[in-house]
């Protein structure tokens, strides 16, 4: 471990990632009231499909998401971090991906507790995980009479910084270089999560959390994706500490509704969600994006939920012109025949490879010029 502390890690790309997510499988299963854990045979089929059809075009990662079980086996990792996802060892998922030339990205949050409270935080003199969680005697929260749907650590508690550092060290060690951390609005202000309960730990704790996360992620060279952030004060904290931020509500059933017409056009700059659709989110936050700046994440793409070729061209082209990721959620058995060509459009994917980040001619939601984007490629 001492040698690990001295290790300098190779820099990772900070360009928007191109990847595949389990989101569609899990969301559809949840809506149907069925088991959301993806069977291993389905993992294998999707990994094979991505490797064959998307990896040659730059989609180099498979990523987990919520919905599925997330557990710690102390016999595998006594530090208390997640060892199993959907009942499968994370190291097995890493190996499956690696065998096909892919990396594994993980949906997890360094503020979440997956283990026994008696677990000792690595790098401390006997500090336990239980001492990191909410303590009514000393923690000033927004809603002390409410409970939390997640078990959060409190960043200001002694040992929290070491716990967060250990989180990124653990993931780097098993081969994970992308972490998608969710429900940040619930931690900060206890709202924005569809009525899910939360105490709300406030702005100071939220900033301290992001600071520790940024320091550890930079140290171990892990890309951070901040999900469901409030983006208060023009995203001052998120753009300072994160690599990528979500700018619109969840994909859910997808389609044109999530791309451009999910209810009336509205924008809320100081709370989650800031807007309901990709188009509004990417336009409204375009002023904070740029080369070397925070990446705008418009959430997952489900091409099988769009009706026309024009709609499918639009959802891919806008995200890439805005310098955002493409997070494919179509699966090997749900992709519509002929739709792969939209994900494989090399002319548009060249924008991602270049690190291109475009801007709309206007960021006024009611000005038609917001449909025209411009920018300069290096080549």
Which sequence ranges carry the predicted segments?
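Active-site-adjacent "subsite" loops/lids of carbohydrate-active enzymes
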Residues: 110-174
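Short, flexible/disordered intra-domain loops and linkers
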Residues: 30-38, 120-127, 189-204
